[in-house]
Curated annotation (Swiss-Prot):
Disulfide bond is among the record's keywords: yes
Pfam families the UniProt entry points to: Toxin_cobra-type
Organism of provenance: Naja atra (Chinese cobra)
Domain of life the protein comes from: Eukaryota
Tissue: Expressed by the venom gland.
The protein, known as: Mu-elapitoxin-Na1a
Family: Belongs to the three-finger toxin family. Short-chain subfamily. Orphan group XV sub-subfamily.
GO molecular function, a single term: sodium channel regulator activity
Cited PROSITE patterns: SNAKE_TOXIN
Keyword Ligase: no
Disulfide bond residue pairs: 3-22, 15-40, 44-55, 56-61
GO cellular component terms, semicolon-separated: extracellular region
Amino acid sequence: LKCHNTQLPFIYKTCPEGKNLCFKATLKKFPLKFPFKRGCADNCPKNSALLKYVCCSTDKCN
């Protein structure tokens, strides 16, 4: 699986074994949905008071 791992959409990395999801975190209160953090995960992180997480399982989907 290949996931973006920076705020720039053309930079990505291959996820290590066992990390089968890509995630993207955006700031909930910020009007633009600019990615705050991206990367690989084994489980989808839980939303927090400040961050909303979206997970997916195909190459470069985050």
